[in-house]
Amino acid sequence: MTAPGLAEIDACVFDAYGTLFDFLSASKRCRGALGDKAEALGQLWRTRQLEYSWLRSIMGAHADFWQVTGEALDFTMASLGIENAALRERLMDLFLNIEAFPDARRVLEALRRAKRTTAILSNGSPRMLTAAVKSAGVEGLLDHVLSIEDAHIYKPHRSVYELVTDRLKIPAERVCFVSSNGWDAAGAAHFGFRAVWANRGKQPRERLPGTLTAEISSLDALPGLLGL
């Protein structure tokens, strides 16, 4: 059944990391080297990656997401007492060539069959997104891949979401924005998108401005919400 607010959607725009792409896949694939620190490294790396993006935005000290990702990994490895340059290089390479969640390709294929415009809007740098889309095997399923580098500031700043309306020439209320990050979904909703939170981790809702249109636990539920 089509969800209220999603009947007149012209485009579906996805966050990348955590939504289409599994940001823990790099640490999982290095479990042999990391041992019992693999999960802690993956989670702390992601947390610092986001925190550094927000702090750099507040400080007016922008650096692209590849640099931020490396700095976050350096902090994480130091925090966990890991000194291994080869392992650091391996983790960064795996993050660059990240794995997609199993439901990512399925939902993009469904949207393609329905002739819906699809896009990514991500903190990732253009180089990172090009590599991720290729490694995930979804190159032919996306009409647009948008990086915050064109806004020179990170989500959830309004100018990032404006990239979508500017490039796609679609009003905000006709865009379905999908993110697994509750704060990102809130930012998108506050901007005016029809925001769908893919709550993969079964987390409580963020106490932030912006009213979500829907909450799902898997991307597989999205086509149904759109009436496809």
Predicted regions and their residues:
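A metal-dependent, Asp-based hydrolase signature
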Residues: 39, 53-89
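Short helix-capping segments at alpha-helix termini
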Residues: 34-38, 79-86, 113, 137-141, ...
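Asp-based, Mg2+/Mn2+-dependent phosphohydrolase catalytic module
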Residues: 1-9, 109, 116, 121, ...
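Generic structural signal for small/hydrophobic residues in well-ordered secondary structure
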Residues: 15-18, 73, 120, 188
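Active-site neighborhood of HAD-like aspartate-dependent phosphohydrolases
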Residues: 2-50
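Short, acidic loop-to-helix structural element flanking the phosphoryl-transfer center
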Residues: 62, 66-67, 84-120, 130, ...
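An amphipathic alpha-helix signature
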Residues: 27, 42, 46, 66, ...
